[in-house]
Amino acid sequence: MATLAASSSLLSCLLVLFLSSVSAVTDDKQVYIVYMGSLSSRADYTPTSDHMNILQEVTGESSIEGRLVRSYKRSFNGFAARLTESERERVAKMVGVVSVFPNKKLQLQTTTSWDFMGLKEGIKTKRNPTVESDTIIGVIDSGITPESQSFSDKGFGPPPQKWKGVCSGGKNFTCNNKLIGARDYTSEGTRDMDGHGTHTASTAAGNAVVDASFFGIGNGTVRGGVPASRVAAYKVCTPTGCSSEALLSAFDDAIADGVDLITISIGDKTASMFQNDPIAIGAFHAMAKGVLTVNSAGNSGPKPISVSGVAPWILTVAASTTNRGFVTKVVLGNGKTLVGKSVNAYEMKGKDYPLVYGKSAASSACDAESAGLCELSCVDKSRVKGKILVCGGPGGLKIVESVGAVGLIYRTPKPDVAFIHPLPAAGLLTEDFESLVSYLESTDSPQAIVLKTEAIFNRTSPVIASFSSRGPNTIAVDILKPDITAPGVEILAAYSPAGEPSQDDTRHVKYSVLSGTSMSCPHVAGVAAYVKTFNPKWSPSMIQSAIMTTAWPVNATGTGIASTEFAYGSGHVDPIAASNPGLVYELDKSDHIAFLCGMNYTSQVLKVISGETVTCSEAKKILPRNLNYPSMSAKLSGSGTTFTVTFNRTLTNVGTPNSTYTSKVVAGHGSKLDVKITPSVLSFKTVNEKQSFTVTVTGSNLDSEVPSSANLIWSDGTHNVRSPIVVYTSDY
């Protein structure tokens, strides 16, 4: 396996050389790599001689001295040579040549998400190592892999004195000075048998591990946002799900154990009333004890009202792309290349395989349409075995191995996500899939090869993931959710060798690629921990505010509510800016109780949420929209009327004394809003001083298709404290 991994890594490097700038040019010639697939099995085949013959034929020169740069002849077949553009075109058409691409200067790759956000490795990023080492992240998930290099305690001292937890991970499970605590609520032991918990924990706080990859894909340094911090794992999930009672027990223990914040990449398909939501209840208790809870928004997008984790005392995270993605090319027998999506580590050794469309291999039990979608029991095994199965949808993933196919090509509705499969596979968007179908219908012997996945860079980003759950918030309609977005697409992080990289996958890996708001959530948890290392006495709401008000604005890339604040909240997280926000919106337990009273919750319900006996009075009750939240949102009763809505807010100075902030309003989308800020200038003489203001929004004839929005920015010339303002009329 080590040899295979090494050759796969080398091949992967060669296949991504077309991503950078050209490095070698001689006159009008430049160095190209001619990739020819696997080595010939013929005993009399000599690669270098073949390469020289090809060059002589293409160039018309008997002596090719200075032309041949390098022959690849041990693990695969190919060569590098100095060619003109016309020579490159000729060699690309020759039999046996898979692809020709320019030579480039390469740099070692990282897993990119933290670099993408500006939190770079080593001395490039300001750190507070002593405080970071005292920071404890509680991970409520499917457990953890203690042997992972991401959780090695090399260089770590003993746990912080505040730590009161235990290591009760079960048999053959040992904690250390990095992984300082483990608890199990499933009777299986805390060891991660799935991989999800290991992945999220390493994303938030994993050590920097060089040369990590998924069989050579994404090779580079994998690390968490706060590598010097400690981890405590709380296992609440099994393959059948995560029980409410286990979740609450984990919150209970984590808070008492002394964690500084909690990351929980768990949720429901839709939001629940707070009193019925174990995460909302647990997070309320965490907030009351000074512990921030970061929660995933859910993977039920792009449909509206699908976001979960909507309580204002939770930092709710959507998922978006980074500047790196993965593509898998499908080369058809006619030479045409289609670009698909998957994370395919398999190599088909340069060999084309026969293609068979599911509907052309229909079993007697189904019609051609069902077989075309490769539905269960609809494909005849005898007509598929040894071939690449083509399916009109992802249903083929369930049957492809059982019918004996050697690969799979399917139509995918998700253009932005690459998944791992247990055999060579690629998902094609409709246009490319139709090209594939046309090819299938044009020949009696269609063939293709699915190439190993390549990394692509500098794509448009960040873009909100299609799967990321959207608002509006149906439980607290005047609280904008999700709050923030972060990298959650094709994230490489530590994994459990006991888990499967994909369903029915027999491979065992230490690092894997996953997508979901489960992946974006620990990114924000890592940012929250990073912010806390510079501001250890900050409350959860101050950290949440800092993250939200310093976020990058996200440009709408689509239409409808799926591309509005209901998709990304305040924007894309910016770790460096969040560590020094200038001003924050601060909240405590009493503010949240006043908010709940304003939602007309009964004393009985309030006790369920807060654990305390609370009697609401007018003095304690506030309109939900007047909660001192970093974003501002209001749901109105109708779209055709003139309206006026106000928001009351208070800012706390956490920057410098004697600072003055001036307000500015930037228009968003939807109907035009008239926004007035009173007062429009705030002056702070001291640190921790508070100043209040009112936002008055007026307008008429609101757009009923999308929310209407604007952005309020307070600036002192150094800090820009931005809050989205959203007004809407329906649940869409």
From Swiss-Prot:
All copies of domain Inhibitor I9, residue ranges: 31-108
Sequence ranges assigned to domain PA in this UniProt record: 352-436
Where can this protein be found? Secreted
Those residues forming the propeptide, per the database entry, are 25-109
Positions annotated as active site in the UniProt record: D141 (charge relay system), H196 (charge relay system), S518 (charge relay system)
- Does the entry feature the keyword Endoplasmic reticulum, yes or no? no
One matching Pfam family, short form? Answer: fn3_6
Q: Which residues form the Peptidase S8 domain?
A: 113-579
Q: Name one GO cellular component term.
A: extracellular region
Q: Keywords of this protein's UniProt record, alphabetized?
A: Autocatalytic cleavage, Glycoprotein, Hydrolase, Protease, Secreted, Serine protease, Signal, Zymogen
Instruction: Cite the GO molecular-function annotations of the record.
Output: serine-type endopeptidase activity
Where is carbohydrate linked to this protein? N172, N219, N458, N555, N600, N648, N658
Q: Which CDD domains match?
A: PA_subtilisin_like (cd02120), Peptidases_S8_3 (cd04852)
For this protein, the record's SUPFAM superfamilies field holds: Subtilisin-like
What are the BP-aspect GO terms?
proteolysis
Under InterPro entries, the record lists:
Peptidase_S8/S53_dom, Peptidase_S8/S53_dom_sf, Peptidase_S8_Ser-AS, Peptidase_S8_subtilisin-rel, Peptidases_S8_3, S8pro/Inhibitor_I9, S8pro/Inhibitor_I9_sf, SBT
Q: Post-translation: what modifications?
A: The C-terminal propeptide is autocleaved.
**Which Gene3D superfamilies is this protein grouped with?**
2.60.40.2310, 3.50.30.30, Peptidase S8 propeptide/proteinase inhibitor I9, Peptidase S8/S53 domain
Q: Where is the signal peptide?
A: 1-24
As recorded in UniProt, its EC number(s) are 3.4.21.-
Q: What is its main location?
A: secreted
Family classification? Belongs to the peptidase S8 family.
This protein is called: Subtilisin-like protease SBT4.13
- What species is given as this protein's source? Arabidopsis thaliana
